[in-house]
Amino acid sequence: TAAAERLVTSDKVNAIMGADCSGVTGAILQNVARPNGIVMISPSATSPALSTAEDDGLFFRTSPSDARQGVVMTNIIMDRGFKTVALTYTNNDYGKGLADSFAAAFEAAGGTVTINAAHDEDKADYSAEVGALASAGGDLLVVAGYESGGGKQIIQASLDTGAFDTFVLPDGMVGQAIVDAIGPDLNGSFGQYPGSENKGADVFGGLASAAGFEGSSAFAGESYDAAALIMLAMQAGGSSASADVMQHVMNVANAPGVQIMPGQLGQALVLLEAGYDIDYVGATAVELIGPGESAGNYREIEIQNAKVETVGYR
């Protein structure tokens, strides 16, 4: 929160694109954004608790709540014929929220969660955690963690000991970096992260490629859209003050209006200045609902030939 406080009090920013993880986002919302009346749009904070957090109308997110991800993950696992899983989650707001959502959805669908256990980040050794997961058993191990942290180490230890050979990877675990680190032993594992099949995603992918980065990586499109919504809401209200911006985020994000794709932000600014309504589609088919969060589409992935491959959309 210190960095966010500095941005607001010293740098005098009018809005924050962020934060990234749910715990940090919640802390900044309550300790910095609300006391100072600053709008936040997070691209990647997915905890269900943020849907009902006291926010004074200041908080939005372009990623869907993990309440939906738990259902999507259940459907993906069930559709592949698996009925029994072990579950480990990173011991924070993100991990606990996703684990609770998934366990409830999976068991309601007739599945069995043999163990639902937290793990801490940045430990030198995860043999005790892997031992407990192995003892509980299951067709698969669901790892609700981070690809650069304890989640990766638990997968590696599970492979080394033969505890599990197939893993379910939620959004925080999806990335080419973990595949490169673990190698072909991760082939056949699968999962999901926010993403949609739409014209905007294709356009954004082309723009990203031209700029030298991978546009389909987790939360890339959501980040672009979060920043775009802040700018467009400022233009719609004719003001950069957060008190005005918060009133226009939902309007520019949703129909009715002229649809705006990635790469058309300049056109959108002109339209808004001329008094037209816009419907920002963006990279992720933005549609904000209820408490100002994405309705939620997911990209289903599988690790094939040591690559993260898209195999469908949910």
Go through the PLM ranges and name each one.
Residues 1-314:
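Extracytosolic ligand-binding ectodomains
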